[in-house]
Amino acid sequence: SAPLILGNDIRKFLKEDGSVDKNNETLRIVSNKKAIEIDSDPLGVQCRREKTNGLCDVLVKPLSDNRLAVCLFNKGCVTQTASFNVTELADNEYVTLPKSHRYKFLDVWENCEFVSDGAVSEAVGKHAVKLYIIESADTAKNGE
């Protein structure tokens, strides 16, 4: 959908001996394979802001294979609680995710999965994001 543009000093991704610093937090973020998958999804649809309270946005991006990416983006200086309901998002004609009784969530940063009826409420740290790839638990890949 868009190139990933870095505005930081990439030399800081290296240790003094010239090897890659795999513990560098910024490098781990920009090289996260699932985040790159969201950015380069073949559906090619941009994200939209679906909800905001002024400090915390809920950003939604339809993905190929009837999946959905949701980003909770806290622009504030204190932790904010952000909430959304996948079932309500699935009502939006912009969203390709089918309605379901249960949804499978992949937390992109934590690399963990959970199943929910679609209602999500999360504490998002200051100047932080939570990022999910969501699909119907009824139609999840690999027979899950």
Segments from the language model and where they lie:
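Mature N-terminal, pre-catalytic/accessory segment of carbohydrate-active enzymes
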Residues: D138-E144
